[in-house]
Every structure is written in C-alpha cells, then in structure tokens.
C-alpha cells in the first residue's frame, strides 16, 4: 500500500501525517519517498519498493483488541490493570527516546510482566519519529526487555499498531508474535536494523 499526496508517493508503512493544514501533510519516516512527480513525470525509487512474495497468504483478519499507550512522566501503572480488564490482547507502547520505560517510583515493569504473563503481547517503539529504538542501550529499556516486551526497531507507531493487529489476527503465541516483529514484511523495518 502506498500513499500519494503532494507529488510524493510514500510507502504506506512509512507514512505519517505531520501537518494539519500544510499541503505537504505527510512525510516518509526512516525511508526515502517511493516516488516523486516532477516536470519529467513519475520518478520511482526502486530501492525503496519492498520485495513481493507471490506466495504470501492474504490474511485480512485483524484483531481489534489492540491499544496504543503513549508514555508520559508519572503514568500510573494501574493503566495496565484497566487494559487487562478490558480484554486487550495487544499493547503498543510509545516509550521515551531510544527506549525507556520508567521503573523508579511508578514502576511499569512489574505491570508489563503481569500483562505479558496473562497473554498480552506488548510491543515497544519510540516516541521519536526518526531513527530506531534500541531498548538494550539503557537500564530503563533493558528492564522492559527482561519482562518480555517486543521491540519494533525503526517502525512508526502507526505501522506497529497495524502489524500487531494483523499478527494477532493470526496467532496469540508470544514467541510467534516476536518472530513476526523481527521480520520485515512490507518495508516497515529498514534492512539491517533488526
């Protein structure tokens, strides 16, 4: 899937709306434009186009029980209790910087462990639009990894939510979910990042 807007074509998994009023409302995050229209016509960047496996099965069943949580300083860990009570099967967490989840005072790691132990798939990405997350860099990310969260590398949060909905439509097994998230299916992860 692609998004074509303002003479630019963006890979759908990399498209993010960055402006509310500007005609160039969308940007391609962590990937060049797939194509641009200029005075010479449509100029396609073949290197950006993801390979297509003709035997890849069409799977249109999506799990709607996915929640996106943007961390803010001091977020109450009981938010995870509420999400478990609602029957959420997947959580995408927009963490701090390269990968940080608070564990001092309001410790989220115990609640991450509880959610994962109860069968919830928890994937983590960065609130930063550009570059990749790496939860192994700092203690605030390492503790989250120890609980079993799944990294999204340089995926946008929009792509992470969509991918989690798609994967949970296929399987609830956490190891299978992690396997799918370490695979670049349609250009959502830059080559060589994971």
Regions found by a protein language model. Give the residues of each.
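Accessory alpha-helical/coil subdomains and C-terminal extensions
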Residues: 2-4, 11-93, 97-98, 103-104, ...
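C-terminal non-catalytic interaction/assembly regions of soluble proteins
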Residues: 98-194
């Amino acid at each position: 899937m692609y998004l074509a807007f303002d003479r630019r074509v963006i890979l759908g998994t990399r498209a993010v709306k960055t402006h509310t009023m500007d005609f160039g409302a969308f940007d391609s995050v962590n990937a060049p434009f797939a194509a641009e229209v200029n005075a010479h016509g449509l100029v396609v960047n073949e290197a950006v186009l993801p390979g297509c496996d003709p035997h890849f099965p069409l799977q249109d069943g999506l799990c709607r029980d996915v929640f996106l949580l943007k961390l803010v300083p001091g977020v109450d860990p009981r938010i995870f209790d509420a999400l478990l009570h609602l029957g959420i099967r997947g959580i995408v967490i927009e963490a701090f910087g390269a990968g940080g989840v608070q564990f001092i005072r309001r410790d989220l790691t115990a609640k991450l462990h509880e959610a994962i132990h109860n069968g919830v798939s928890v994937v983590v990405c960065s609130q930063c639009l550009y570059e990749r997350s790496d939860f192994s860099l700092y203690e605030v990310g390492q503790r989250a990894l120890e609980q079993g969260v799944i990294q999204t590398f340089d995926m946008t949060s929009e792509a992470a939510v969509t991918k989690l909905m798609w994967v949970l439509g296929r399987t609830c097994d956490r190891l299978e979910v992690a396997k799918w998230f370490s695979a670049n299916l349609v250009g959502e992860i830059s080559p060589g990042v994971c």
